[in-house]
Amino acid sequence: MNVFEPRLSSWLENAGDDDDVVLSSRIRLARNLKDEQFPIYDQKEEVVDNIAEVFDDNFTLIKMNQISKLQKALLVEKHLISPYMMNKSEYGAVLLNEEENVSIMLNEEDHLRIQCMTPGLRLFDALEAALQIDGYVEEKLTYAFDKQFGYLTSCVTNIGTGMRASVMVHLPGLVTTKRIKSVIEAIRSLGFVVRGIYGEGSMPASSIFQVSNQVTLGKTETEIVEDLTQVMEQIIMQERVARTTLKQKFHIALEDRVFRSYGLLMNCRIISMQEASDAISDIRLGVELGFFEHISRQKMNELVLFSQPAFLRKEAGRDMDELEEKVIRAKVIREILGDK
């Protein structure tokens, strides 16, 4: 297993339900060990070793103090660790399976953060996988649990189930038709949170949004997933309607925009992250509307991931200034799009 190589995790490589709109689903369970101080206050490396002993050879342990800054950044870009773990977790670690659809962060804000990712809208599959791992760990270690409040966590907003269910969606139709603001307001009024592609602290960009639950206390895991799934089904429907409207009423203008973006990425020699992200979003929309039969969703995911700064530094084999990064990004994008 070499997680630092430029390859897609299984949840970005494989097909999933409603994946014309939904990029991925994720379930994250926050857990702490009984009689151990929460890692946000006091990190202990032996806690990592004790937890890691529970898992078999199907998981690879990666300790943060044994890898480079570049390798940490690669893990963040692949959504396998959080920006918090990259920047603040001295004695943190992550357990990964071969498919990279299970990521168990150790000594992040909590002792364990069990993440299971699936392609498309498959929250229940992710929940089943996460609860299976959680049950296995709970048979061998004692969690910090209160009969009244549920699982105890470093952040009070996670107390209860300790669960965050989230869905990453691409909503260019709603953005272009200027309906996204009202949709986000409706989502928030139902008790859900809308963030950017890297979750907490990140802003939505290039029509990619992450929608997650806010309430963890007073509802079961199944109820939370059912509620979020229902919300996402409504969002998916509205996004498809918006795309159909754009194609029917503004076909030439939309086609021009999409093919201009394609021409830009096929021929550019210097390109910024933001410009590339916006163009990739346009092309992804074009793929879903049938403008590009030779471009797969998998290739679109490659464009998104491998044009990120850390992957570009790995491609170049060195640190780069801003101009060099833009040049390498343009080269990588041309190579991916040109590989039919």
UniProtKB/Swiss-Prot annotation:
Keywords of the record: ATP-binding, Kinase, Nucleotide-binding, Transferase
Pfam families, sorted:
ATP-gua_Ptrans
Write down the SUPFAM superfamilies for this protein, in alphabetical order.
Answer: Glutamine synthetase/guanido kinase
Q: What is its EC number?
A: 2.7.14.1
Coiled-coil segments, which residues?
none
Record bears the keyword Transferase: yes
Q: Which InterPro entries match?
A: Arg_Kinase, ATP-guanido_PTrfase, ATP-guanido_PTrfase_cat, Gln_synth/guanido_kin_cat_dom
> Which GO MF terms are attached to this record?
ATP binding; creatine kinase activity; protein kinase activity
Q: Which reaction does it catalyse?
A: L-arginyl-[protein] + ATP = N(omega)-phospho-L-arginyl-[protein] + ADP + H(+)
The processes (GO biological process) annotated in the record are: phosphocreatine biosynthetic process
Q: Name one GO cellular component term.
A: extracellular space
Q: Which residues of this UniProt protein bind ATP?
A: 24-28, 79, 113, 164-168, 195-200
Please indicate if the UniProt record lists Transmembrane helix as a keyword. no
> Which superkingdom does the taxonomy of this entry point to?
Bacteria
The first-level EC class reads: transferase
Give every Phosphagen kinase C-terminal domain span. Answer: 21-242
Protein function: Catalyzes the specific phosphorylation of arginine residues in proteins.
Which NCBIfam families does its entry note?
PRK01059.1-2, PRK01059.1-4
So what family is this one in? Belongs to the ATP:guanido phosphotransferase family.
This chain's protein is named Protein-arginine kinase
Tell me what organism the protein belongs to: Listeria innocua serovar 6a (strain ATCC BAA-680 / CLIP 11262)
Q: Which gene encodes it?
A: mcsB
